[in-house]
Structure formats: C-alpha cells, structure tokens
Amino acid sequence: MKITSKLAAILCAAALFMTVGCSNGGETSSGSSEPDASGSSGTADVSSASDSETNESGTVSEEKIMDSLNNGIIIDSVSGNVYKNEMNANPISPNIFCADPTAVEYDGRLYVYGTNDQQQAEEGTKNDYAYIKSLVVFSTDDMVNWIYHGRIEVGEIAPWINNSWAPSIASRVEDDGLTHFYLYFSNGGAGVGVITSTDPVGPWTDPLGEPLVYQNMPGLENCPAPFDPGVCIDENGVGWLSFGGGTPADGNTMHSKIPKIAKLGKDMLSFDSEFVSIDAPYFFEASELNYIDGVYYYTYCTD
C-alpha cells in the first residue's frame, strides 16, 4: 500500500492519539516496550494466562490487560474472543502516552512523531507537561501494524531548550543525494527549535544551537506565544513555517491575526521573508501546515 502525503495529513487530523486502550488481538506489531526500572523490556503473550484471569467467554479480563499495560508490557495476542474496548482504543500505541502528532512518508513507511506525554507518568519525575523534553516516533507500512522506535531525547541533543512539544516534520532530497529531515518543535511557549537528521529515526543533531523563533523577535510584536510550528515544503522545494499562540480569550476573537507564516531559507534553518499574519478566525493555538495537490492547508485550534 502506498502511503501518500494526503494520508499523512488525514492521519494527523484524525483522532490519532486517543485515550489509551488495548490494540486488536492477533498477530499485531507493536514495537519494543519501554524498559522497566531494571533496564529490561519485553512482551507478554496473555494467551497463557491462568483460568482465574479469564472471564466466562474465555477472554482475558480487562483488569489483567490494563495491569499489563500499566507495567509497560505489550500484549501480543489475547486468547478466546478478541478483546477491544472500542471507546478507548488507540490504534498506534496501547501503552505509550503521546500527543500532537506530525507525520512524514519515507521509503514506503509513514513515520509519526509526537510529544512524549509518557514523561508525565514516570516515577520520580515532576508530573507536568512543563518538564517534557523528549519526543516519540512510530512507523508503519500498512496503517495497521506499528513499530515504536523509542524516544528522541531533544533535551540531550539541544541542552538549551526548555521543552519539546508539538513537533512538525518535513523532508526533501538535497544536493548530496540524501533525504534530509527537519523536525521543528515548540520550545515551551517561548519559541520554536529544530533538529535535523538524514534518517527518520535519527541520530538527530542541533544545527543552530539556539531557537529558530523566539519571543520578542522583530515582526512578532502581536504574537505572545510563538510556538506550535507547522512546516511544509511545496512542489518547488521551498519550505514554509507557520506558528503562533495566544490566550484562551483569543479563541473568542474573530480577527486576532496572531498566527504567522514565513518562507524558510534554502537551508530550512533561517527565514527568507518577513513574517506575515494569518487571519485565522477565532485562533488560539496548534498551528499545522500541509501542502496537498497545489493547495496549502492551515489547521489550528480555537479552544
């Protein structure tokens, strides 16, 4: 199945990272689980569960499944009837909390990146999004079976950051013949950073050593929170970056003109135009930019 940029955009716009639930039973690929406190990781086939752990239909109990998920174990299959809580099903990740997805296609696979909300649940850490400094990445070649490639430790790659939220990614083949990936992220609410790689799962480098966008940057006087980047590359290979955020009250304003867009330089690490305001009705945050069949699509959140 060929995955197109249209599918990537649809995937990002859909309920991609919903409330954690259990994946379909059977031979599904979920990737590697997170290591436990001892540094080990593994999977569990709950078809070997004892009779006391199954209900009358021969299906492993919901309590057993959720207990396994909470302990960081991936369930490969379920005995008896297939268990699936359709109201709380995450089609990509049954045990890793994620948010703010962005996607890119490469070599027949779709790579999806998200904010690593799992950090909020880790023992011994401050359970607050204000301390998130990593992203996560998954991939698929059929939109059904997913591989978890682990974390992108942005805080180690770029030690100057405050946070890494809400990524947006773009790629293109450059003069060296390699595909280069540009992964933009929110540096908290204060700006936008970017890391780069020639492989969709890294290793990643910090080419600037500082933010690409920051508060009080010339041209951003009415953009109080220049975060939530949205990047795309058009048919001419030109990159564009949108971003911006206001306050919840701005979501009640028809013409705040808070979000901005600018043409990126050839290096994708600088700007080649002035910032232009986007007149997005009732804009609040969560900019995203897609270029599909000659049309630019700008999506955002109003609340």
Provide a role label for each language-model segment.
Residues 30-65:
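Post-signal peptide N-terminal segment of mature Sec-exported envelope proteins
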Residues 27-28, 174:
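Small/flexible residues
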Residues 23-25:
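Bacterial signal peptide processing site
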Residues 18-21:
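C-terminal motif of bacterial Sec signal peptides marking the signal peptidase cleavage site
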